[in-house]
Amino acid sequence: MRYTILSVAYPLTQVGPDAAGGSEQILTQLDAALTKRGHRSLVLAAEGSHVSGELIASPKAGKRLDDAARDWGQRVHKELIRSILGKISVDLIHMHSLDFHRYLPVSNVPMLATLHLPPDWYPAEIFALKNCNLNLNCVSSTQRRACPPSVPSISVIPNGVDVNRFHPTHKKLGYAMALGRICPEKGFHLALKAARLARSEFLLAGEIFPYSSHREYFDRRIAPRLDRKRRFIGPVGFQKKIQLLAEAKCLLVPSTVAETSCLVAMEALASGTPVIAFPSGALPEIIDHGRTGYLVSNVKEMADALSKVGSLSSAECRREALARFSSETMVTRYFDHYAKLIEGGRSAETRVQDPRRLSWLVG
């Protein structure tokens, strides 16, 4: 059966193959798979996004990403969703953003919200909704355990990456690297400290989004620690990321928050590159300590791990990624879940939302 799926991204962030955020990358993979399999994929995302299906572009909010821009983006998203549902027969809405509750439509269309971030970053009330057509999904078992135990129906579909686009190389170079959004919770200043302590070359790749806290973090915590051996190379496209991960001796993931998943760690392993990380959130689900990387507790242990990471097997890292982190497995599980929710929504009139139950959320 051919479905029409509306995927909704965060209003202020573009989606596409080169997107920095995990939620944008997962949305991009699902959009491509829907289109490839003959479904109609509608993507509501910021202007400038690149999708395989049909882009419904939300206008840019301006150069500054602040509370006013966020509020404006949420209002625009809400109106666009209402307009889409008035014109197109949508089978399911898949929300991917932290603030999805601000533009939930009042509709009998089944809705799935994937929680890409720690559960305590979302309003507690989303876990208390009953008898409505909003369904929640987690991206790791660790994240699911952090959700309120009173909500037994949250599904778990682990993230995956396109492992076939990453390839090991025998030409390993001497640098460690880190990659991601340049923001305080990623802890990249700690990776710089560890690299300096280990006297290791280090590359930091990523985008600085125009949030004042992100810019301040880079200026105060990152820039002063850069030198000829430890460099910041800015954002990189997908092809460059493939090369960098393959040639790195290891990936460093010094996250200071409970990661719900870690796509770049999966990509590194698919490249035959081991990962050294703090045991934050779901990272112990991804890294097999002493076999595909090391789980460390502090900067000193990260530096020590840098000195011995060369003894780990690149082939073993690659085998682990192929066995556990394939995007094909993720996509199949999502599509099965879509079908279940769509068929359930068609047969259960009690799942039609009462606007009064969601008024506190949608404003």
Model-found features: residue ranges?
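Catalytic cores of nucleotide-sugar-dependent glycosyltransferases that transfer UDP/GDP/TDP-activated
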Residues: M1-G363
